[in-house]
Regions:
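Conserved N-terminal entry element of GNAT/NAT acetyltransferase domains
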Residues: 1-12, 161-163
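Conserved Rossmann-like nucleotide-binding pocket used by diverse enzymes
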Residues: 6, 80-82, 116
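Acetyl-CoA-dependent GNAT
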Residues: 12-89, 100-111, 158-162
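Conserved hydrophobic/aromatic "anchor" residues
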Residues: 35, 58, 130, 136, ...
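Conserved glycine-rich acetyl-CoA-binding loop
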Residues: 83-101, 110, 115, 121-129, ...
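C-terminal "cap" of GNAT-fold acetyltransferases
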Residues: 114-117, 121-125, 134, 144-163
């Protein structure tokens, strides 16, 4: 894919496109306020992926203070992946990987996060494989996490350079 892929920070004018991709790809949908609020608070970890100038995917994260998902009772800042989606025709081309890596880099560099974590449907094998390939490990399960009652794996990774 290479040179025609551009990962950049979300801008307000991207909102309609990102909401459309979210509706197209995921059953978990959000109000426009939710997107704008996350962008206002954590602009460096709300990213879009452009292919030939058109947005085909996004990632948005929330920066949280809490405890390590990988070590007991270790307080730290966490990068929580709230939502990531890539349009079906553009999947399996490294776009999700590029979004994840850039969001984790920015989380570390801009907000001082030590770990990244996310929830993923237990049946979403392609996503689980992607996260495992990136180095995420399953650290727990949330029962009936999704509105339809499906469980979620909680997966986490230490972001490089953790002191």
């Amino acid at each position: 894919l290479g040179s025609d892929l551009n990962i950049r920070c979300f801008r307000a004018e991207d909102l309609d496109r990102v909401m459309t991709i979210n509706l197209e790809c995921l059953p978990e949908n959000y109000s426009s306020y939710f997107y704008i609020d996350l962008h206002r608070r954590f602009p460096k970890t709300f990213l879009v992926a452009e292919v030939e100038g058109e947005i085909q995917g996004y990632i948005m994260c929330r920066i949280e203070r809490g405890f390590s998902k990988l070590h007991t009772f270790r307080p730290m800042k966490l990068c929580h992946v709230v939502s990531i989606a890539v349009r079906e025709p553009y999947r399996r081309r490294g776009i999700g990987t590029a979004l994840m890596l850039e969001a984790m880099r920015n989380g570390r560099k801009e907000y001082g996060t030590g770990e990244c974590y996310l929830e993923v449907r237990v049946t979403n094998e392609p996503a689980i494989r992607l996260y495992e390939k990136l180095g995420f490990v399953k650290v727990g399960k949330r029962r009936s996490y999704y509105l339809d009652g499906e469980d979620a794996w909680i997966m986490a990774i230490a972001i490089n350079g953790v002191k």
